[in-house]
Amino acid sequence: MPGLRDAGPDAHRALGAAGPPGALGEALAALATLDALDAPVYIPGPDGPWDAVEERLDTTGQAVVCTRWGQWLTSALLDPELRPLLGQDWPRYRQTPVASGRLRFAVSRFVMKHTAALALGVNAGSLDLGYQLGGRPVLRGLGGELEVSLAHTDELILVGVSRTGPIGVDAEPADRDISFELLRDQVCTPREGEELAALPEDERRARLLRLWTLKEAYTKALGHGLRRRFCAFGFARDGEGRVVLADLPGGGDAGDEGWDFVTHPLGECYVVSVAHRTLPAPSPQPRSPEPGLPRSPRSPRSPRSPRRP
């Protein structure tokens, strides 16, 4: 198995990050001070602590985990079950030519499996991860009721899990140099383009980056990836200041309801966006009568309690 000796300088620098020093480390540590239940939770390794993730899952049905891939690297490489844990991703891991990219890939799946396992209360190795046509990760079999999403860039790994509906996550470096002139027609609706064009350059770049990550997160949640044109839908703020879908063809439909969109800066290092849709709870189904005991029309059995989200 490829290991530390072929990791390359980038991976060794990541491995050396036993703690969270530097600007990103400070930003991740600061997440613990946030009270917002929609904020990402920093998990420094497989041993957690996972309490905040469990709290968010119990309270909202979804949670977002973030970490530095170097902090999970040793645990991933020394795990004797890494190959079965990666499953169908093992060939891609082995065939990725650049060592740092190969290890980052393995760690990202390692983090996603451990986060999903925590949400489901199972062992990470028991989960079977597959991919839809657009690249969206899906858990099959045992974890089929849990939605998952993954993003990684530079040092950062971001994983979203949801028991209550689709979820998508995206992250970009906060200092990413993006050209409004080149991307306007590809990313923005006409209204969004006009609003951004009226802003000072620095504010416009920051707003465009935030918009980009929101649209990435939304299309990931839908499972469309880059197949859906970003300029075909937009975002705006409603009367309460919440981010909502806008500029939809034909005014939208019922499938556009129930979405929540949030963006969080990780200090001055990254911009993180999350799209999550809470689906209606399934209607309770009545129990079938026991064999040989016809149900009394005057004494119907209690309906089956809906599954806890």
Q: Where do the model's predicted regions map?
A:
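Core catalytic alpha/beta fold that binds nucleotide/phospho-ligands
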Residues: 2-309
